Amino acid sequence: MSLTELTGNPRHDQLLMLIAERGYMNIDELANLLDVSTQTVRRDIRKLSEQGLITRHHGGAGRASSVVNTAFEQREVSQTEEKKAIAEAVADYIPDGSTIFITIGTTVEHVARALLNHNHLRIITNSLRVAHILYHNPRFEVMVPGGTLRSHNSGIIGPSAASFVADFRADYLVTSVGAIESDGALMEFDVNEANVVKTMMAHARNILLVADHTKYHASAAVEIGNVAQVTALFTDELPPAALKSRLQDSQIEIILPQEDA
């Protein structure tokens, strides 16, 4: 789906996506991530709030109670089959008896559901949503770290979370990202979430990157690594030429599942 599908303005759509994902963002954060001035962000917030797409707050903006959430729910539903197909491919890649890191996000939550028929998995995750999906399987051992709990995505962050993760060596890391740059940089929005992901990357034997096509054109501020570190990219569309070339040069497997597979 195109990034201009909601408003016809790519920057406005990116601002809406950030707020939909995070729940609330202040003006300085938005200016930094969108690479514009704070004055531009204030104008954008004013315009979008007048359209009922977000709610203005002192120093920032948050989700609207209905319109923007409905728009993003429709976007999510339209991509559900794609995400399910990607998730099934990831689950097929992981054998029974594995130790797995799983990060935060709606995409990896699909992977968690796809793993439910596996046996004897040990899962370390900093997502309470992922843990809640997986703990029902009595054949799984599910572990979560201590730390600071984020209300908008049920993620656990902070030094204690990273320290807990560092005590393990996982067979696989399943993670998504905020954006993939054309030079192969893997980017995230939040520095605190990024620190936990970087620790997981350093302690995983195989990194399985789950990213739909929108990540090729997104923008985020915090670099967590490079595609050269990845074992396999699971996606719904082939990457742009420059990124595809980097993946091939690094012998990274690109897995492109069919929706009806």
UniProtKB/Swiss-Prot annotation:
CDD domains named in the record: HTH_ARSR (cd00090)
Keyword Transcription: yes
Protein name, UniProt field: HTH-type transcriptional repressor CsqR
Record's signal peptide: none
Keywords: DNA-binding, Repressor, Transcription, Transcription regulation
Domain of life, source organism: Bacteria
Induction: Negatively autoregulated.
DNA-binding region ranges: 25-44
Annotated GO biological process: negative regulation of DNA-templated transcription initiation; regulation of DNA-templated transcription
Gene: csqR
Function noted in UniProt: Involved in the regulation of the sulfoquinovose operon. Represses the expression of the yihUTS operon and of the yihV and csqR genes. Binds DNA inside the spacer between the bidirectional transcription units comprising the yihUTS operon and the yihV gene, and upstream the csqR gene itself.
Complex formation: Monomer in the absence of DNA. Exhibits a high level of cooperativity once it is bound to its target DNA.
Residues covered by the HTH deoR-type domain: 8-63
